[in-house]
Amino acid sequence: MFEDEPHAEGAAAVAAAREALQALCQELNLDEGSAAEALDDFTAIRGNYSLEGEVIHWLACSLYVACRKSIIPTVGKGVMEGNCVSLTRILRSAKLSLIQFFSKMKKWMDMSNLPQEFRERIERLERNFEVSTVIFKKFEPIFLDIFQNPYEEPPKLPRSRKQRRIPCSVKDLFNFCWTLFVYTKGNFRMIGDDLVNSYHLLLCCLDLIFANAIMCPNRRDLLNPSFKGLPSDFHAPDFKAAEEPPCIIAVLCDLHDGLLVEAKGIKEHYFKPYISKLFDKKILKGECLLDLSSFTDNSKAVNKEYEEYVLTVGDFDERIFLGADAEEEIGTPRKFTADTPFGKLTSQASVECNLQQHFEKKRSFAPSTPLTGRRYLQEKEAVTTPVASATQSVSRLQSIVAGLKSAPSEQLLNIFESCMRNPMGNIIKIVKGIGETFCQHYTQSTDKQPGSHIDFAVNRLKLAEILYYKILETIMVQETRRLHGMDMSVLLEQDIFHKSLMACCLEIVLFAYSSPRTFPWIIEVLDLQPFYFYKVIEVVIRSEEGLSRDMVKHLNSIEEQILESLAWTNNSALWEALHASANRVPSCEEVIFPNNFEIGNGGNVQGHLPMMPMSPIIHPRVKEVRTDSGSLRQDMQPLSPISVHERYSSPAAGSAKRRLFGDDPPKDTLMDKIMAEGTKLKIAPSSVTAESLSISPGQALLTMATTTVTGTTGRKVTVPLHGIANDAGEITLVPISMNPTQESTAESPVSLTAQSLIGTSPKQTHLTKAQDAHLTGVSKPKRTGSLALFYRKVYHLASVRLRDLCLKLDVSNELRRKIWTCFEFTLVHCPDLMKDRHLDQLLLCAFYIMAKVTKEERTFQEIMKSYRNQPQANSHVYRSVLLKSIPGGVVVYNGDCEMTDGDIEDATKTPNCSSEPVKEERGDLIKFYNTVYVGRVKSFALKYDLSNQDHIMDAPPLSPFPHIKQQPGSPRRISQQHSLYVSPHKNGAGLTPRSALLYKFNGSPSKSLKDINNMIRQGEQKTKKRVIAISGDADSPAKRLCQENDDVLLKRLQDVVSERANH
């Protein structure tokens, strides 16, 4: 079959591979069918890819896949999977370590495009390996604490079989205890890859062996005489053990980061019944496990049973940790004695370093820090082991809910009763339904996960329910304070809000226990759409201050997963939301807050619109009032610019009715009605509002104008107008939406207007005031609502990742903005490109095509090298990209034509569910770029080709790039134990001696510092910030004299407010 090989070198390589595989199969006693399949797969992969490293290692990967596919008929159970060849034997014969195997296996799965089920199997296997490695690293020091050091024992002398038995050594005890643990753990599959439960099961095994050593009169020499858990009279000459075996679970939990309640639960409900079953089956026997007459038989029986388990059910022989070659086979750091040679120490340290690097790269137990959401992280905690970190997470969770019940508190009940319709009955019904669904799926075995015991499910559920009511109460208190006196029925009647919040609490509990049921398991079993679930994540993080740093990282990474891929699946509710909003995808400028854009190259915020005149100069104090750093006290500042009400409802302005999760409907404010029905003001035939206004490249935004209309009450209202000039020379005046009936008081922290700056403010309705109070001085985006919030977060996430890539690749700001413009074009005009794909895929393609068009080329390898360093990077993102799906799904367009409205409508409609599975054609990112992406984006990208003069005039203006605040939570508390805060240095005029005391480190005399200390001791109050004054204050030395009169300043302030309100 190899005569057609084009090169002799290739034929020789295949022949060598065949020989190596034959030798490997003979050593493993493997059947010919699996060997032939393994060789065929290896040959096919080698023909398409360059396989680096030893051939035998890649053959081991191919052989393992072939063995897992093999089915062998059996006498009792029908069929058995796996050829009775364990992974450990394959790796041992191929001289391949487990860490190397997992690394190569991931690449092999990508190259072979193996099914998702097999990938999940490898992930479970790798997690089980990591759990076992972590547990073994804890097992050794705990064993040394209880028993004698097995490494200091003299070697056993060889003896004949006829010689009488000798007592077990400490080394034998060490091996027996570990083997009993891994065999017991294998029986409870729901415990196997759960780090917390596995650790407590280990403590139970150690407790059992300790009790047997104490109860055996001639085996107490195995114990460490300095162990703190020994009975108080242990060292007395006449010591006699009690009739009941002693329990040291509490001592071990206290000394070695255990959770007493959890460990006792494992011992009573799982371990003790199982050990009794082993005695009933005669696997274990004897009054004492360590008796001279029974230990050898017990050890052999447990090892035999475990070997059968590995061949039939298991895959990874965890006794590999006990072998002399453990360093080479797996990378386990070993215990060593004081006289261990230095060279051996260096070798072990190197292996331990490799193992640590593997865990750091894998991040199974300590999640990596995502690029977004870092402002919510607390200070770093002391470095701990994974077990200590996991048990501390559970302890922290238990401390958060300590003293609370899984029911509404009195304060929460009062909030429920204050609502127009008491929502308590419905909330309890929802929570109960979620609990029943959770317990059912948590205890149910599937192909992906073994089922857990109902006790575990009930325990996790109870913690989640307590946390749910605690966080719900915090949210309601914050919302009540934020939306003064507003009825909370609107929010509390949203079932999806309660379902999302409860799901988030369950995810927190599962993560704290290091459960193998990782996200998105919880939303899948609760049938909760990711597009709805993400909204609650930031709310939870802001509401519960007790969450650990790792927990916040985990929740942030979940939000990123949803924004980057989970919300873009074919059956996502996102497409329904787009369809409901007339298939109009919002641009970045429409959803980001106006003051959150980077300053353009020309020095103005509106750098993306070069023909727009620059804003008037803004007084520093005005700028301060209009931003988050204004005179509003820090403790009174809103926690987020988006309230929970806005996340879960999208009302029309001035309407008390809210639509769940729909985008805000077309603006139908009172002013619009006045303009359309009252005075029939005919300034222009256009009826669009400023919110829906889009400026094409051929149009120019002119300065502001005003007109006066009379409302139904007879009041006259001044309406600011946009002036837009088009190519035909016509000017269209478009009114900016505002509500003439708004009421507010001067002291309320409402959105800033020009009139409020000079002391008179328009009236505002109570509902609008409640909704806008949190936007203290910050202009709203053009589009708000559920869809706008989603795209705001998507644009923010993409901008953070693009900024990181550009910094690593030294990309100019100009090219970065062109990449961003191209990326935004694909989201807005080609939304179907994101369906069943990943945000990073479009971002990387936009990066490459714009770099190529602008002649600032970066090779694909350079881009991917920088991308892989991002915390969320995963090989499947660029190795497995959807090309097309049949039926339905993505339509691959040929040609350079842009999508029509009809195309967008078809793409955003969710296809009907079909019983037939969707067939997907997938390839790597390069293939997607060449076959799909270029055809859709090429004509747009070429408009920025500077070498072609014809395209320069057609190039659309560059989209604004979101700005990232370096210290959004300033001043930031850097320690939970001390009242120590850090804030960025404010650029401005230096403080004068009359207004403040100044001390420069390494520059000022000690007297200056003493003066500051004396002032603090005397309790002088901090000087309050001056409020802006329009009239000149002659006695203020720090204030420049204003050369303009009040009318001119008022006009400039009106321009500022109007401009900021609409851009």
UniProtKB/Swiss-Prot annotation:
What SMART domains does this protein map onto? CYCLIN (SM00385), DUF3452 (SM01367), RB_A (SM01368), Rb_C (SM01369)
The molecular function terms of the Gene Ontology recorded here are: promoter-specific chromatin binding
Keywords for the protein's UniProt record, in alphabetical order: Cell cycle, Chromatin regulator, Nucleus, Phosphoprotein, Repressor, Transcription, Transcription regulation, Tumor suppressor
Q: Map out region (Domain A) in residue numbers.
A: 383-584
InterPro entries from the UniProt entry: Cyclin-like_dom (IPR013763), Cyclin-like_sf (IPR036915), RB_A (IPR002720), RB_B (IPR002719), RB_C (IPR015030), RB_fam (IPR028309), RB_N (IPR024599)
Phosphoserine PTM positions: S640, S650, S748, S761, S959, S970, S983, S1004, S1036
Domain of life assignment: Eukaryota
Q: Which residues carry this modification: Phosphothreonine?
A: T332, T369, T385, T992
The record's Gene Ontology biological-process terms are: chromatin organization; negative regulation of cellular senescence; negative regulation of gene expression; negative regulation of transcription by RNA polymerase II; regulation of cell cycle
Q: Could you tell me which residues belong to the region Domain B?
A: 780-944
PTM: Cell-cycle arrest properties are inactivated by phosphorylation on Thr-332, Ser-640, Ser-959 and Ser-970 by CDK4.
Q: What function does the entry list?
A: Key regulator of entry into cell division. Directly involved in heterochromatin formation by maintaining overall chromatin structure and, in particular, that of constitutive heterochromatin by stabilizing histone methylation. Recruits and targets histone methyltransferases KMT5B and KMT5C, leading to epigenetic transcriptional repression. Controls histone H4 'Lys-20' trimethylation. Probably acts as a transcription repressor by recruiting chromatin-modifying enzymes to promoters. Potent inhibitor of E2F-mediated trans-activation. May act as a tumor suppressor.
How does this polypeptide assemble, per the annotation? Answer: Component of the DREAM complex (also named LINC complex) at least composed of E2F4, E2F5, LIN9, LIN37, LIN52, LIN54, MYBL1, MYBL2, RBL1, RBL2, RBBP4, TFDP1 and TFDP2. The complex exists in quiescent cells where it represses cell cycle-dependent genes. It dissociates in S phase when LIN9, LIN37, LIN52 and LIN54 form a subcomplex that binds to MYBL2. Interacts with AATF. Interacts with KDM5A. Interacts with KMT5B and KMT5C. Interacts with USP4. Interacts with RBBP9.
Name the PANTHER family on file: RETINOBLASTOMA-ASSOCIATED PROTEIN RB -RELATED (PTHR13742), RETINOBLASTOMA-LIKE PROTEIN 1 (PTHR13742:SF20)
Q: Which family does it belong to?
A: Belongs to the retinoblastoma protein (RB) family.
Q: What is this protein called?
A: Retinoblastoma-like protein 1
Organism listed in the record: Mus musculus
